[in-house]
Amino acid sequence: MFVEALKRQNPALISAALSLWQQGKIAPDSWVIDVDQILENGKRQIETARLYGIELYLMTKQFGRNPWLAEKLLALGYSGIVAVDYKEARVMRRAGLPVAHQGHLVQIPCHQVADAVEQGTDVITVFTLDKAREVSAAAVKAGRIQSVLLKVYSDDDFLYPGQESGFVQHSLHEVVAEIKKLPGLHLAGLTHFPCLLWDEAAGKVLPTPNLHTLIQARDQLAKSGIAIEQLNAPSATSCTSLPLLAQYGVTHAEPGHALTGTIPANQQGDQPERIAMLWLSEISHHFRGDSYCYGGGYYRRGHAQHALVFSPENQKITETNLKTVDDSSIDYYLPLAGEFPVSSAVVFCFRTQIFVTRSDVVLVSGIQRGEPEIVGRYDSLGNSLEA
């Protein structure tokens, strides 16, 4: 999906990854991250967000819940980390990093609620009154006032399969009335997902019905004299979409893919955020005229289509196509069109969620100045690996 953008925006990353692979320093099934570029992307986002008065929570799941990288990004001015689930929150808290938002997309399990409250999570999203009561009880026990966000939806909204959740908008007044009765809770705001999506036909990011539902819910509360301080609208957050969010009065957003430049808007390599990671593999064998490279990092929603194959013998890079991958299979290997020498390196660049892969994550600094140096190795869940 992003091979052309990678070649255009960050050819130095390709060269660095291949050089480190040739030295035996990077194994197949590794996501190689250009640390300096991802920090530059983050800096640009923070600067843009400040121009429009929007706070940013840092989303880390796309780059493997990596605490080392998260700490560097937080130093740029992000308002904390949004933990997409309780396991990500655990990784970040163990690293001593601030989790600012928890409960969205995945609710906090009952026996983890108290810890989230006691650790000082800025806002906790709830989908049900039952979960709100659990948060209330934990807040009372901890002697704290816990801010919460309500996830809302309407019947015509777009919800990803497996993510169906929230309070239906027409019940919002009744829900808020119940929330107000719960001690230890402060209704801070509303959220929904996805609020923006890339439209291939239009060639740009557009608001979803979900964003309109979110705005209507805010206005509904305002008419009843209920003011909220946070209107959280995640999905497709980037330098080019932040002005659009500002037009709708959004106060908080949660960039993830834009940090690595792997947003659909960047397929041509023309966005402010530049490609900052690639996936490295290696040809294992041939079968019936095609080549098979080591798998482990394939993401079925990633729109992977093309790959660059590097032969050490002639130092030649050839572009080829990824053949159809059967969705019922385990990605032990990925099939590439044509025969290439065994043990050639393979470079992919596609939209991923590293935390659901088996990949290693290799952090490399100094790429843009021609002095690549590996500064960290982690697994896909943010655990440090031996050098």
Spans of model-derived segments:
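Glycine-rich tight-turn/loop motif centered on a GG-T
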Residues: 23-34, 118-124, 159-166, 201-208
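C-terminal accessory subdomain/extension
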Residues: 290-387
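Active-site-proximal beta-alpha core segment in soluble small-molecule metabolic enzymes
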Residues: 57-188, 192-198
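Active-site loop ensemble at the mouth of alpha/beta enzyme cores that anchors a bound cofactor
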Residues: 237-317
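A charged N-terminal "starter" segment
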Residues: 1-107, 112, 381-387
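Active-site loop/helix belt of alpha/beta enzymes
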Residues: 154-268
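Aromatic/hydrophobic pocket-lining residues that form π-stacking "cages" and hydrophobic walls in ligand
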Residues: 45, 135, 214-217
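Conserved active-site and cofactor/substrate-binding residues in soluble primary-metabolism enzymes
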Residues: 33-40, 64, 68, 87, ...
